Amino acid sequence: MMTTLTARPEAITFDPQQTALIVVDMQNAYATPGGYLDLAGFDVSTTRPVIANIQTAVTAARTAGMLIIWFQNGWDEQYVEAGGPGSPNYHKSNALKTMRNQPLLQGKLLAKGSWDYQLVDELVPQPGDIVLPKPRYSGFFNTPLDSILRSRGIRHLVFTGIATNVCVESTLRDGFFLEYFGVVLEDATHQAGPEFAQKAALFNIETFFGWVSDVETFCDALSSTSFARIA
């Protein structure tokens, strides 16, 4: 059953059962004091409402029959997946730079199996959800995301998570180039950096690459669909 979501710059219509809700990198690294972003000097003090809004969006999406995909950004314990000096990631990843500048943190940031890598306690994947590791900002790079989506006939992606201006925007942009329709729920995302980074990312998305809505509007759009499915 199709539903129409009020969004910027215009409404978008989609079938929830052919749509995925993507939760980007809601790990301690990005959303919890003492995690990577916090240790690297980024403000994570306002992430709690984002976590609550993601919980709300996930519940509504699951009720409507949407696929839920959780991303976790990071690398193996030896950081082979992060790339060496021949990779731009080695030079631009703030996690890698922070560990080089603070040797006591070596091996603690974004390493698989670490507290930093884990999803925040409030967000727990359920049976039927898909959890994907990713080694770079985009969720399409070196992951099976495209295959997973195409095999299920999914063409619409609803994005939540951190950071709006880095991994969320990178994944949505790559999806745009692969012919996916991307929507960001702005109050279920958070930027890395000053507030203007959030505004700039949302401007780019709604102007060039996708659509922007919010959690309440998303839930309202799905509610009639869910009732119709139950009936």
Swiss-Prot record:
<dbReference type="InterPro" id="IPR000868">
    <property type="entry name" value="Isochorismatase-like_dom"/>
</dbReference>
<feature type="active site">
    <location>
        <position position="134"/>
    </location>
</feature>
<dbReference type="InterPro" id="IPR019916">
    <property type="entry name" value="RutB"/>
</dbReference>
<feature type="active site" description="Nucleophile">
    <location>
        <position position="167"/>
    </location>
</feature>
<keyword id="KW-0378">Hydrolase</keyword>
<dbReference type="GO" id="GO:0016811">
    <property type="term" value="F:hydrolase activity, acting on carbon-nitrogen (but not peptide) bonds, in linear amides"/>
</dbReference>
<dbReference type="GO" id="GO:0006212">
    <property type="term" value="P:uracil catabolic process"/>
</dbReference>
<protein>
    <recommendedName>
        <fullName>Ureidoacrylate amidohydrolase RutB</fullName>
        <ecNumber>3.5.1.110</ecNumber>
    </recommendedName>
</protein>
<dbReference type="InterPro" id="IPR050272">
    <property type="entry name" value="Isochorismatase-like_hydrls"/>
</dbReference>
<dbReference type="GO" id="GO:0019740">
    <property type="term" value="P:nitrogen utilization"/>
</dbReference>
<comment type="similarity">
    <text>Belongs to the isochorismatase family. RutB subfamily.</text>
</comment>
<dbReference type="InterPro" id="IPR036380">
    <property type="entry name" value="Isochorismatase-like_sf"/>
</dbReference>
<feature type="active site" description="Proton acceptor">
    <location>
        <position position="25"/>
    </location>
</feature>
<dbReference type="Pfam" id="PF00857">
    <property type="entry name" value="Isochorismatase"/>
</dbReference>
<comment type="function">
    <text>Hydrolyzes ureidoacrylate to form aminoacrylate and carbamate. The carbamate hydrolyzes spontaneously, thereby releasing one of the nitrogen atoms of the pyrimidine ring as ammonia and one of its carbon atoms as CO2.</text>
</comment>
